[in-house]
UniProtKB/Swiss-Prot annotation:
Lineage, broadest ranks: Viruses, Riboviria, Orthornavirae, Pisuviricota, Pisoniviricetes
Function: Suppressor of RNA-mediated gene silencing.
Domain of life: Viruses
A biological-process GO annotation: symbiont-mediated suppression of host innate immune response
Name of the protein this chain belongs to: Suppressor of silencing P0
UniProt source species: Pea enation mosaic virus-1 (strain WSG) (PEMV-1)
Family label: Belongs to the polerovirus P0 protein family.
Keywords: Host-virus interaction, Inhibition of host innate immune response by virus, Suppressor of RNA silencing, Viral immunoevasion
Length: 303
């Protein structure tokens, strides 16, 4: 695939696009929030919002939010390319520099588009087939992993990856989540997909994702699977989540959305969580990547 060739999407997904001006406004908000904090928490917040901002910018169904005109795509080796309108990428580089991350625009421009290679900031495994769904999970898991490494007073590192349901779903082993326990992952994905039509809910959606993971850490069933966490920063994150009406019951450590997902699963006990959600999202992603129904058999063999 060409370095800045934008994926072609079905019309119904194109209708969900926001504007380039909204992308720029999101970056403005990223800078503003980073400036309000200090110390290690500011560094974590800056890195987290920066990575999430990148992750939200490609136009592929199944990502946490839908953005027009900007997208990520893998290239050979350990590189990612962030592509989009020149104006948006220039603003992105400026804010990244203010947050301590230097990104050089080292890909040729084509008309009003530009591209930035992110090899200096992204360490991705070479031994897996990197489609957009995998990038979705990887970009989400890396900043979260570093956040929890800090909370646990450990050296920040990227989490290991295990294969989930099909090669398009690499679920991070962070917090002990594997393909055998997909509920929290699915709740995160459903929750953030629901926010795609509500741009003003971007920040609460990010906080909810963090709060769900924090809450999972505090549950007794997982307490032996991960390092112990130190309370002050964790409570700060959960406090932000409560302020934004994300957590409805801090004692049980569930988000309202997770509760609804679990209740829905109980109401349809005869149907598989995997067959309903994963196959549906998988099909949407394959369509967006240009595969047709006739390719299903070949794709199944490939995966």
């Amino acid at each position: 695939m060409h370095g800045i060739e934008q994926p072609q999407l079905p019309l119904d997904y194109v209708h969900r696009c926001a504007s380039t001006s909204f992308l720029l406004a999101s970056l403005d908000g990223l800078l503003s929030e980073a400036r309000e904090l200090s110390g290690p928490l500011a560094l974590i917040t800056s890195s987290y919002y920066l990575l999430v901002s990148i992750a939200l910018c490609w136009a592929i169904p199944g990502s946490f939010w839908y953005r027009p005109g900007c997208w990520l795509q893998p290239v050979s080796g350990r590189n990612l390319i962030f592509c989009g309108p020149t104006e948006a990428l220039q603003r992105f580089r400026l804010y990244a520099a203010r947050l301590g991350l230097v990104l050089s625009e080292n890909c040729p421009r084509h008309g009003q588009s530009a591209a930035i290679t992110l090899q200096s900031y992204w360490a991705l495994p070479n031994n897996i087939w990197m489609d957009m769904a995998q990038l979705d999970l990887l970009t989400f898991s890396m900043p979260i992993a570093n956040t929890f490494a800090y909370l646990a007073d450990c050296e920040a590192r990227f989490p290991p990856i295990v294969e989930g349901v099909g090669s398009a779903y690499y679920v991070p082993t962070l917090l002990g989540l594997t393909h055998q326990d997909p509920r929290l992952y699915l709740a995160l994905r459903r929750r953030n997909l629901d926010l795609s039509g509500e741009p003003h809910r971007v920040r609460p959606g990010v906080l909810e994702s963090m709060a769900l993971l924090c809450s999972s850490v505090r549950s007794t069933s997982r307490s032996r699977q991960i390092p112990p966490l130190y309370g002050s920063v964790l409570h700060h994150v959960l406090g932000l989540a409560e302020r934004d009406c994300i957590l409805f019951d801090t004692d049980s450590n569930y988000s309202s959305y997770t509760h609804r997902v679990l209740e829905q699963d109980r109401n349809r006990a005869d149907q598989s969580l995997f067959s309903i959600d994963l196959e549906y999202v998988h099909d949407l992603e394959l369509i967006a990547l240009g595969y047709s129904d006739e390719d299903d058999e070949d794709l199944d063999n490939f995966f």
